[in-house]
């Protein structure tokens, strides 16, 4: 989403990322961006509702499923909807979309957004280091460190992000978890039990 926001900034279009910061898996990246002075890039979904109109475009990134969007209220209130995703299409897709960029052969949504960035604006407008590392982390996560679902385009996107300043060492730090998080996850896994058709009961 931060890559799409950078495209909006390059095009001088006001934009924000609607995200519940207390429930996102991208907390480390968001914290790094906030520390770099980009706190205004983010807004709570409920806080976004008053600024939405029929002229507002909602860009959904990395999912096509209605049940996985950050806020259905935002989706329903926006006048236009665009979807950027790489997952193979199944049930529950967003029917309201006015524009769909669906590329199942891409390794990740980050790869697609990185390709878009190479065709927008001048070199000086490109993502900063933290934004580039966020995109690279998306590629590394979805490809399991470039071992699955990679192609020429994947490595070209990664090379572009390296040119923008992304460092793999910094990217790996985004995946680091605290000891509290690690022990909590380990406890959840160890206490999980099989229940009715392989559903997990804790």
Regions found by a protein language model. Name each.
Residues 15-17, 81, 135:
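Hydrophobic/aromatic residues located in beta-strands of well-ordered beta-sheets
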Residues 38-99:
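Active-site cofactor/cluster-binding pocket
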Residues 5, 30, 71-75, 158-159:
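Short amphipathic alpha-helical segments and helix-helix/interface helices
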Residues 1-52:
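Anionic-ligand anchoring segments at beta-strand to alpha-helix junctions in alpha/beta enzyme folds, i.e.
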Residues 202:
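Calmodulin-binding IQ motif helices
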Residues 1-13, 88-199:
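A structured phosphate/pyrophosphate-recognition subdomain
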